[in-house]
Amino acid sequence: MRKIMEERSLVFHRKGMPSPGIVARAAILLIWLAPGLAFGQDQTKPLIKLVATGGTIANTLEGRIPIQQTIADIRKNFPETLKLLDSVKLEVIDIIRVGSGSFTSKEFLDIARTVNRVIQEPEVKGVIVTQGTTTTEETAYFLHLLVKSNKPIVVTNSQRRHGTVGNDGDKNFVDAVSVVLSEEAVGKGVLVVHNQTINSGREVLKTSGHPGAFLSGMHGVLGIIEADGVSFYRAPTRRHTSNSEFDINTITTLPKVEVISAYYDADPGLIQAAVDLGVQGIVLNGLTASGGPHRAQQPLLERLAEEGMPIVRTARGGMNNRVTVNPQDKFIAGDNLLAHKARILLQLALTKTSDLKEIQRMFNQY
């Protein structure tokens, strides 16, 4: 119990944190929560672990607030949510309070380890991760590849600050609870819930700073959340979560992989600079539709591939574009993954092997 309270208290001791007034209100809220360390004390209710990492969903115009305050305000301001929220136990684990645009591999690994640990607890129904929108799609895909469970795991967020006009975070959080409770969410991998839609962690992309900006390209959403409940219309077909060969328990650091873009007048010196920095692999955000490099980049990339460095071709046209294997070169085809997601998969692949054929197999399967 002490450990959990210490985890929650971390949020109040980081540099640049809330104003004294916000801290005081949060302290009162924590005292209210302390007896049971959860919203809802009935042991027969489904238990949802909430892994909180900050983000706009836990920010107001006055500054940062704990996610517990966000939930308390939802309960107070929207009594129609009480039936749902009172039907579950919510336990909060505050692990990070950093803007998601500042996340490093350490934060990603910490989140993955935490989610993987708590999801294994037999009494846990599922996990909700709240974070900033900036890297939601990367967090979701990272967890999608690493967490070993069929239980529902939902990442949600907010584009507008809590308590402001048009705030979307309150609805997103309530919808996330509904999705975790849905039996249809079991075995679907890591899901991103935003603007009443359910997206796969593999495909979702933030397209703007507006509510409703999380989309999945031509593939479409997995499902939707409406007044009468949660509805799924398709399921991921690529390997993920419990069917993944990647194991967070064996990974302490991530290999260095950089993304290089193709464009006119592209200078191959940038590729050489990445090599000089010690990269173990390169993802090319290449030309649509081939995912190929600019002509000036081609010789150096081909030489690196011949020497055994994995060079993954992706297309800057986005997920509506599929890059296929070219038997004439040794580049790895990134399929329809966006460059920054291909980077995640390549990093994890390199924790297992440096064999180019094996890495291509992984890109074919994930």
Give, region by region, the residue ranges found by the protein language model.
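Short Gly/Thr/Asp-enriched flexible loops that form oxyanion-binding sites at enzyme active sites
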Residues: 129-151, 294-301
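Bacterial N-terminal signal peptides
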Residues: 25-36
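N-terminal secretory signal peptides that target proteins for export/translocation
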Residues: 1-22
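C-terminal non-catalytic interaction/assembly regions of soluble proteins
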Residues: 289-366
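Short acidic, glycine-rich surface-loop motifs adjacent to enzyme active sites
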Residues: 121-136, 277-290
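ATP/NTP phosphate-donor binding region
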Residues: 41-118
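Accessory alpha-helical/coil subdomains and C-terminal extensions
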Residues: 45, 51-52, 58, 74, ...
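Internal gly/pro-rich beta-alpha loop/helix module
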Residues: 155-227
